[in-house]
Amino acid sequence: MTGEDERIEMEIRKRNGESVPFQQEKIFNAMKKAFDGQGKEIGSREMDEILATVLNNLSVTVPLTVERVQDEVERTLMERGHYEVAKAYILYREKRSALRRVRHTIARTVGDDSLDEVLRRIQMDFTEEVYSLAALQMKFESFCRPGMTEDERAEALTKAAVELTTAEAPKWEFIAARLLNHSFRCRNAQEWEGRGGDLYGRLRYLTDKGLYGDYILAHYTHEEIAMAEDFLCPERDELFTYSGLDLLLKRYVIQSRSRVPLETPQEMFLGIALHLAMNEGSDRMGWVKRFYDMLSRMEVTMATPTMSNARKPYHQLSSCFVDTVPDSLDGIYRSLDNFAKVSKFGGGMGMYFGKVRAAGSTIRGFQGAAGGVIRWIRLVNDTAVAVDQLGMRQGAVAVYLDAWHRDLPEFLQLRTNNGDDRMKAHDVFPAVCYPDLFWRLAEENIDAPWHLMCPHEILTIKGYALEDYWGTEWEKRYLDCVNDPRIEKRSVTVKDIVRLVLRSAVETGTPFAFNRDSVNRMNPNGHTGMIYCSNLCTEIAQNMAPIEHISTEVHTENGDTVVVTATRPGEFVVCNLASLSLGNLPVEDEAYMERTVETAIRALDNVIDLNFYPLEYARLTNQKYRSIGLGVSGYHHMLAKRGIRWESEEHLAFTDAVFEHINYAAVKADAALAREKGRYALFEGSDWQTGAYFEKRGYTSEKWQVLAKTVAVQGMRNAYLLAVAPTSSTSILSGTSAGIDPIMKKFFLEEKKGSMLPRVAPELSMDTWWYYKAAHLIDQSWSVRAAGFRQRHIDQAQSMNLYITNDYSMRQVLRLYLEAWRAGVKTVYYVRSKALEVEDCESCSS
């Protein structure tokens, strides 16, 4: 634009009555667009002449209005013979006028003038005809009834946008989120009126009300909180889908005791960041910003307990816990008590029952006295129902039993609908620990005998616990027990067990599968222990040991009699989880991924020291191993965005490369953290230190070899690093697909509290449509093979589901289990039959 020296200083009155400085550049740009739209070229000199004429004619107009300016542009274009351009400009004005009318009508009907700006932004950002606000207006007016309050009308408007969401118009879920966010912010402003002020004032108020942990303001100065407030990016609220924002406002942000949300989404992310960076030394506010950015950009999600409880008075941040149940009355009830305390604070549980004696075993030499594991599991079931996670939902627990345990047949019928109801436990999730020998026989000689024995009898007669061994050593001792006539055996065939497993899996989705030899073979900390089982969602694989009673003594203190019970803490596993949202990350950008992984690893490491532990046993184990579990979500989202089909070799090659780099970045970041903050206590002798970790995984390239040497010198901060959780809830928050699962459908309606909510595959469009194949339509062999490629790079395990249809035969399902075992996959989570609905675990949703 030329003629800058001829700028006219005056004001223009906008349509809302507001007077603002006149900007002649806007006239120039509008005319330029009109010419460009008609494919007409115009020289800068002629454009300046037209503009000068318009400005000269406007200079005598008082007051100057938007309509007067546009009328003058039309007249000048016509006078200079640009009829087609003038016509296009007139049509453009008419279109803009229609857009304004529909905005004003909706805002007036709701009774909220501030809504107009939100609707204007929606029109700017969603320009396709399918997202016309006229359609929203029609749907909205069909919901309006006489006597509705302003809040009810605003809710009806949001509902209208939700119901316009279809497979062909998926972005309505983003429009609905903006409308929901506007309604929320209006209510939130009213709630804080006269209370808060700046962020520090709001945090002080929440702290005084007992809703915010006082440790935040104790660790940060007023100036630091003010600096943190400057980090807030409210525009990132526009990343939410309706489902994600609705879930976040209902379950994650801080609420008053009357369930009114008091925290904005961005304040929630910032509060979590403030908590996780609390103990950082140098550049603490820099880490607050990095943590906030990764969360608010939805590139990383922390586990549900961390998202919900960080910054709160009871900050239980861990997702799952795993306990080894001892074979004693005191030990079993201690484990039940541990589960109750974990459940009270919202944690899920994995419990290993492989050491508990079988039904009919001896107690203090009395034959047939033991009731077996089923009776104890029923108590676990009742505890899960009774201790209902702060009144939100009942407890969740997976119970694990070895494939050679004498109570296995009854265990495999815990959740089935037939049989004696006194032997059922419908609210627990059974899982079986399989040795290699079992799968080898299932593959090579399924009619071979399989002998079920009691662990207590083996320990009494042989002097060792069979479950304490794995691999060839386990197999040697198993055969030794089989050949010992003193040990009572319940002999069946491998086929009998396989049939029970598959029947239960197809009917109930369980038992989960834990391939114990694959797990222990790749355990980087096998030098200090044994992994008996996994957690509730089958992604955790860490050393375990039962809590042991040492003594009970009576003392006198200050004249009072005190009973002191001493226990050896064992290894009570804790899962601290987060997930990389692969669908929202540039996974090909190695530098960006390394920075993101580094930030996530640091945040998880901080969880260990900042956590509120429901049990001292958990705290001791967590501080000894400092185990974390960085996983992923948005896996199918990632593939579809890149035009990669699930059932393709390209998928396998891509996932191999992506997960190798994630692992490389994680190990590199963890070694650097060890140099800065110190290594975990049991590093010496680990596979990390000896280099066996890298050798077992075939990491022979130069960069891996350099990293292996660095690790040997600097150590590792955390004993375990990677674990892929299901992310059923937090993937909704971040608008991506769950975990490593394929999507269920491109589009479906979910019934929720009497209304139907649309669920749309992430970024569904004509570009991604053909790459989103539904889970039950996918050849599951591809899923298993992909899991095998990923497993090489994951030191723990994956929540990997199998999706089957009614057409699957038992032999086909068995073949999938065998393929998983051969591929080195450590665990199999649910078998999701198309006719079966199974509950998602919310504890591990990272």
Describe every region a protein language model picked out.
Residues T2-I8, E18, S44-L270, G286-Y292:
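Core nucleic-acid recognition elements
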Residues Q413, H426-V501, A505-T508:
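Polar, glycine-rich mid-to-C-terminal structural blocks
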Residues V260-D330, R477-S504, T508-A513, V658-K709:
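Gly/Pro-rich turn-and-neighbor structural signature
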Residues I254, V260, F269-R284, V288, ...:
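Function-dense linear segments that define catalytic or interfacial modules
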Residues M294, L336, T596-R619, R645-T727, ...:
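Internal maturation/activation junctions in enzymes
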Residues Q23-E41, L115-E129, L270-A277, A738-I743:
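Short, surface-exposed, low-complexity cationic segments
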